């Protein structure tokens, strides 16, 4: 009887062994001012920033924050319960956009999203505070392959990121309550 039970459990265990770990991500405490929802705040800010990307030139701190938000959204938004109007193509859009912004910054392809988020947010804060030592520590070369100086230069002169802009717009749309028609509400 015990042998039979073990034989029944083995295929289930084998099936679980091949699954990759589930990615998770979070934004640091205090990232969103007030009592706002961090997912909504990230989508609205990133959508606004990438909707007018030309204004990012020479603004590496703003670029770092917006890309950190996109990295967070790529992990959290596709399965988020706050998405009121889910865009069906959001997950593949985010995957393609993530490759685009990671390539533009020189982020290691296998870098865990939380390390990317933490590094970019710490870099943004270090830039705001004028702390060069903290800036170098925020962008470790095993995650940011161009090193701190190279990554900072890339953040200050981002190339056009059309896939990122499209994914940011889709993320923003997915959180906006769709308009209800007066006719539909009376039916």
Where are the regions that the model predicts?
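Mature extracellular/secreted ectodomains of secretory-pathway proteins
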Residues: 43, 47-186
């Amino acid at each position: 009887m015990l042998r039979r039970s073990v034989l029944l459990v083995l295929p289930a265990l084998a099936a679980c062994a091949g699954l990759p770990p589930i990615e998770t991500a979070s934004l640091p405490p205090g990232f969103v001012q007030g009592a706002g929802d961090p997912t909504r705040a990230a989508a609205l800010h990133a959508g606004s920033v990438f909707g007018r990307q030309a204004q990012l030139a020479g603004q590496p701190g703003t670029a770092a924050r917006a890309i950190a938000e996109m990295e967070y959204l790529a992990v959290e938004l596709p399965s988020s319960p706050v998405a009121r109007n889910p865009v069906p193509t959001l997950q593949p859009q985010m995957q393609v956009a993530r490759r685009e912004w990671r390539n533009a910054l020189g982020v290691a392809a296998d870098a865990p999203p939380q390390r990317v988020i933490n590094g970019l947010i710490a870099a943004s804060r270090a830039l705001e505070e004028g702390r060069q030592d903290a800036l170098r520590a925020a962008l470790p070369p095993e995650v940011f392959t161009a090193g701190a100086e190279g990554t900072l230069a890339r953040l200050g002169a981002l190339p056009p990121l059309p896939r990122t802009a499209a994914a940011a717009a889709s993320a923003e749309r997915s959180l906006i309550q769709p308009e209800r028609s007066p006719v539909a509400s009376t039916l």
